[in-house]
Amino acid sequence: VEVIERRTNKLVGRFLHEHGLSIVVPEDQRIKHDILIPPSDTNGAQHGQVVAVEIMAQPTRHTQPLGRVAEVLGEIDDPGMEIEIAVRKFDVPVEFSEAARKQAARLPDVVRKSDLKDRVDLRDVPLITIDGEDARDFDDAVYCEAVELGTGQRKRPGWRLLVAIADVSNYVRPGDALDDDAIERGTSVYFPRRVIPMLPESLSNGLCSLNPDVDRLVLVCDMVIPATGAKAGTVTAYQFYNAVMHSHARTTYTNIWAALQQLSLIHI
């Protein structure tokens, strides 16, 4: 029996220089071997620093694994070091492929007139985004208004609710470079004080983010909800359509809750 292929060929750990030898102690406690670093492969790492290591020779029954320091991340107590360790420990993709970067660079900075074809114009509807205080990208927006449902004696109060999500599909098509990178990532990864986006920043924080006071392409679910009767609070009719919107405000959960509790007045 022999090992055909090993999954781990890169890892993060502490660089130690003791008794004339340089080793890296892996951050991942499931890895029981320390990595021996030849003098020519330390990359200037100092004792105690956190480093990223590339495994050059896997361990055998009689020898330790050999590696080279590919990157010196810094001191263990540097601000944000826990994030740098997590990114490498879990192999979170940080850099986009060259093809994806080139494709993103070719996209426009703003919504063009040609993009509006076959879209409902909702730019006058006061849609708003509601997110956390530290959010940088805004994926969805909402608008709700009181309406009268039915006619004549069958009139009853209700609500019209619009939920709009950024129409990423207008810019990212199946099988293109941006799509390939997005599939590899699967999702944006959120750390305290840092986000590793699924798409390049020009899209994640730009064209595909419903920023205030700019036009954005969206997919909308337009719903009708009775306020009274047996179906009160239930969606009784809905339709989906492509639209263009213009966010009227970037709000947060905190100030919306405060407004609902009438603790403060905010302009929306």
Feature annotation, model-predicted:
Residues R6-L265:
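Conserved, carboxylate-rich catalytic/transport cores that coordinate ions
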